């Protein structure tokens, strides 16, 4: 009801008002947007609803003021500065003027909007048009639209004008009646005073409204400080009340974010620092500092002797740095007392200056003690022991004893495994070095020894190299000097291995026609019977034979003396017999091996071989001949599968294969008896010439007997008809390493030992006479040679054709397989054609046992050679360990 009363009062009508029809003209509402500070609009009059749609409701029509009564006062009102409304007013100024006249003269509008103001016909009607025209002309000259700021300026003190001002406050964003429109045109001069400034700000507002995101403030003069804060606030207040453009600028960051910075200023004027401001503002810290320095000033003024005590405490501070990193960074880091100095500076500091001087002196003293001249620094660097490690590790004592002990501990495992000058030392020195070496080995068992393996996966035993040195040290100086004089070019370790292999392989057939038949045949007999003591006996007899051969060739009668010496030597040294290692358990064998200073060896036979070699090097080689001859029968009975495996290529019937073991032992016994009875060279020659097959058959037997690796492995698997592939692999690897060296003995005249007895006795006679001269005194490196001599040294070109031929002949000539193979057990050729992975161990065992015998090839191949052959042919092969 108040809004309706306002409309009636603004119309300046003396008659009571009529309530307008509310629902008839609402069908055509004018779409508009209210300003932010606008109040809800009141009910509009009928004259307002009759206005055309193109006109803005914030701007009244200039023609409607002609009909106003005389007593109506014209309220002064600011208009909204809307650019859209401004443009609409500028484009069509005359058209609303004509429409306003029509609306004013319409009968329907007078009946609703104004209660017949023109029909009264008062005297003031002639006066009002002149005033309204002058106002209209002045309004047309104004530039820009006016903003409705929420208040109306007053031009007269009439009661209707006051009421109209109240109505203007309520209808800030509404369209007024024609009478109000004419009365509002009476305030152009006051609005023009502010309009000039507002026009300058409209450009900025337009620029910001195009982007709608206000750009970043770049004006530095707007940053607020403590000094110009009040002036800036005044400018902001005055500018914010200017217009819409400044209202948008108030939302920028520059105005609101500057207030916290005003409090950051330090008392000293050094700039905004958060930490110092907090320390200075806190009153508790100031109280504590004031109390502290009051006490310290009293103490310093009362006692002058106490000034030296802080120096002692400060000297102890560098001891806190326990790392190299802290020691180096201490020169550049501030102490805790130095960090308190900025707080102390703000207070009255008589004490602070003294403290600063003392700290500076202390820093100078520390730097003078650490900094050295270039020459002194170089000398210090040369004198100190370098230890590798990170600088962050805690420091230890800098004493040179600790560093030297550390370096000695580092160098101990890095030392050589054996001394190179052992061959030229006297026996006593050699024995001392040997005992020291054994103790050293006992102390240096680690993962490096465990990880020493060759290409085939078996362990490499570098400890056996030391057994050679020990054996060399145990022999007499006479033999040593003779060997050194005869073999000046064979003192290296590797050449000794090859020469030992020459002597052992050719001993059965080459010693018999020699001028000393008894000793040579005894060597062969001992080799056939005793696997372990062979090397030492062979070395002893060979050394004696070498001396006699070089001096002269005696007759038959002279041959008895060396024989008796050889026979009497075991009898005299038989007191400590070699223990029967074959009867020991695996745990006992490992304990015995560790007692000699060696690491644990994998495999029972390897441990037994190593223990026998160690026992021979310690107690002598001749003392164990008799005990080993007693043990040989038991060992050879346990070797039945191995001898069977060796003799399969030589014999085609199973009966001969089973009967080869006992004739071997019997042959050795008969040879010894015949040696004791006849002791003649002719008998040995007759034996060699009349039984060539037996000698050729004994050659592989000799190789098997000298191969220490097979003895105990066969014993472990003596109940098995076919040995395991790993045993077969090791067995044939050792045999082939000997076969390779046997071809070197005969000056490359023969490839490798063959089936047929082709070598002539005369040729063997020459070779046997030359071999003892080249043979070194030690023969304990045979096992080491077999471990290091792998079968890959065999020429692949020589045997690849035989392997290929054997694979193709298997279904035709193999007695153990079917004629064409079967689905459950295909032949090797069928497996290769079907691209089945060939297990190298099984294929090598078949070649050595059966395959190469089909093509008349007596040589045996190793797993490495078979692998090379498979890779050269493009055959898929794998190891059995990985295949499982």
From Swiss-Prot:
Family the entry assigns: Belongs to the SLX4 family.
Bias kind Basic and acidic residues: ranges: 195-211, 394-404
GO molecular function: 5'-flap endonuclease activity
Protein name: Structure-specific endonuclease subunit slx4
Basic residues biased stretches: 309-320
Region (Disordered): 1-324, 394-434, 459-587, 618-707, 753-781
Low complexity: bias regions: 294-304, 535-558, 648-665
Role noted for this protein: Regulatory subunit of the slx1-slx4 structure-specific endonuclease that resolves DNA secondary structures generated during DNA repair and recombination. Has endonuclease activity towards branched DNA substrates, introducing single-strand cuts in duplex DNA close to junctions with ss-DNA.
Main location class: nucleus
Keywords associated with the record: DNA damage, DNA recombination, DNA repair, Nucleus, Phosphoprotein
Compartments reported by the entry: Nucleus
Post-translational modification (record): Phosphorylated in response to DNA damage.
Assembly and binders: Forms a heterodimer with slx1.
InterPro entries (alphabetical): Slx4_ascomycetes (IPR027784), Structure-sp_endonuc_su_Slx4 (IPR018574)
């Amino acid at each position: 009801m108040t809004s309706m009363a306002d409309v009636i009062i603004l119309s300046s009508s003396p008659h009571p008002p009529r309530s307008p029809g509310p629902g008839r003209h609402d069908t055509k509402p004018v779409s508009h947007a209210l300003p932010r500070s606008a109040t809800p609009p009141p009910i509009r009059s009928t004259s307002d609803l009759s206005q055309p749609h193109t006109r803005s409701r914030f701007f009244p029509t200039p023609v409607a003021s002609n009909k106003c009564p005389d007593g109506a006062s014209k309220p002064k009102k600011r208009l909204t500065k809307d650019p859209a409304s401004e443009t609409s007013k500028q484009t069509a100024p005359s058209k609303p003027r004509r429409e306003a006249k029509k609306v004013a003269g319409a009968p329907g509008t007078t009946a609703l909007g104004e209660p017949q103001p023109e029909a009264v016909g008062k005297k003031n009607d002639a006066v009002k048009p002149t005033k309204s025209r002058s106002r209209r002309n002045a309004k047309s000259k104004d530039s820009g639209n006016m903003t409705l700021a929420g208040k109306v300026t007053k031009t007269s003190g009439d009661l209707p004008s006051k009421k109209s001002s109240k109505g203007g406050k309520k209808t800030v964003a509404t369209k007024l009646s024609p009478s109000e429109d004419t009365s509002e045109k009476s305030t152009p001069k006051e609005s023009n005073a502010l309009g000039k400034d507002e026009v300058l700000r409209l450009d900025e507002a337009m620029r910001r409204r195009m982007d709608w995101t206000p750009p970043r403030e770049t004006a530095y003069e707007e940053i607020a400080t403590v000094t110009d804060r009040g002036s800036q606030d005044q400018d902001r207040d005055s500018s914010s009340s200017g217009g819409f453009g400044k209202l948008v600028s108030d939302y920028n960051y520059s105005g609101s974010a500057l207030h916290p910075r005003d409090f950051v200023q330090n008392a000293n004027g050094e700039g905004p620092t958060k930490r110092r401001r907090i320390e200075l503002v806190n009153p508790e810290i100031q109280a504590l500092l004031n109390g502290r320095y009051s006490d310290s000033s009293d103490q310093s003024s009362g006692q002058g002797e106490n000034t030296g005590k802080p120096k002692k405490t400060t000297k102890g501070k560098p001891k806190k740095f326990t790392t190299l990193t802290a020691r180096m960074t201490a020169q550049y880091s501030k102490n805790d007392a130095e960090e308190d100095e900025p707080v102390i500076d703000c207070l009255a500091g008589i004490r602070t200056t003294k403290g600063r001087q003392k700290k500076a002196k202390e820093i100078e003293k520390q730097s003078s003690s650490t900094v050295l001249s270039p020459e002194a620094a170089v000398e210090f660097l040369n004198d100190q022991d370098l230890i590798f490690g990170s600088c962050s590790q805690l420091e230890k004592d800098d004493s040179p004893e600790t560093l030297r002990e550390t370096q000695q501990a580092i160098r101990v495992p890095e030392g050589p495994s054996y001394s190179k000058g052992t061959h030229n030392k006297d026996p006593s020195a050699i024995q001392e070095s040997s005992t020291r070496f054994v103790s050293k080995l006992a102390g240096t068992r680690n993962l490096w020894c465990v990880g020493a393996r060759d290409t085939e996966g078996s362990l490499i035993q570098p400890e056996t190299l030391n057994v050679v040195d020990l054996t060399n040290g145990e022999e007499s100086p006479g033999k040593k000097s003779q060997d050194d004089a005869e073999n000046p070019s064979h003192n290296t370790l590797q050449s000794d291995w090859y020469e030992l292999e020459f002597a052992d392989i050719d001993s059965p057939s080459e010693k018999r026609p020699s001028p000393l038949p008894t000793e040579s045949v005894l060597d062969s007999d001992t080799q056939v019977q005793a696997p372990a003591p062979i090397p030492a006996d062979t070395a002893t007899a060979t050394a004696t034979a070498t001396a006699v051969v070089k001096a002269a060739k005696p007759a038959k009668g002279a041959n008895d003396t060396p024989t008796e010496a050889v026979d009497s030597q075991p009898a005299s040294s038989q007191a400590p017999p070699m223990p029967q290692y074959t009867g020991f358990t695996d745990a006992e064998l490992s304990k015995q091996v560790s007692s000699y200073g060696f690491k644990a060896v994998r495999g029972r036979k390897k441990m037994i071989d190593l223990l026998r070699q160690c026992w021979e090097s310690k107690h002598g080689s001749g003392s164990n001949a008799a005990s080993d001859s007693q043990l040989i029968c038991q060992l050879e009975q346990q070797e039945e599968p191995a001898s069977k495996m060796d003799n399969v290529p030589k014999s085609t019937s199973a009966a001969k294969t089973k009967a080869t073991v006992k004739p071997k032992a019997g042959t050795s016994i008969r040879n010894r008896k015949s040696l004791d009875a006849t002791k003649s060279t002719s008998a040995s020659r007759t034996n060699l010439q009349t039984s060539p097959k037996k000698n050729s058959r004994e050659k592989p037997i000799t190789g098997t007997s000298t191969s220490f690796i097979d003895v105990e492995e066969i014993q472990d698997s003596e109940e098995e008809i076919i040995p395991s592939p790993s045993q077969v692999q090791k067995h044939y690897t050792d045999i082939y390493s000997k076969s390779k060296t046997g071809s070197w003995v005969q000056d490359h005249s023969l490839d490798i030992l063959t089936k047929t007895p082709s070598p002539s006795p005369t040729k063997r006679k020459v070779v046997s006479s030359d071999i003892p001269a080249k043979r070194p005194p030690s023969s304990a490196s045979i096992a080491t040679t077999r471990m290091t001599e792998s079968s890959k040294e065999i020429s692949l070109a020589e045997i690849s054709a035989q392997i290929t031929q054997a694979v193709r002949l298997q279904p035709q000539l193999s007695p153990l397989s079917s004629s064409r193979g079967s689905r459950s057990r295909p032949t090797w050729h069928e497996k290769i054609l079907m691209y089945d992975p060939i297990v190298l161990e099984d294929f090598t065992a078949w070649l050595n046992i059966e395959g190469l015998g089909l093509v008349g090839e007596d040589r045996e191949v190793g797993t490495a050679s078979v692998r090379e052959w498979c890779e050269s042919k493009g055959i898929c092969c794998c190891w059995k360990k990985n295949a499982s």
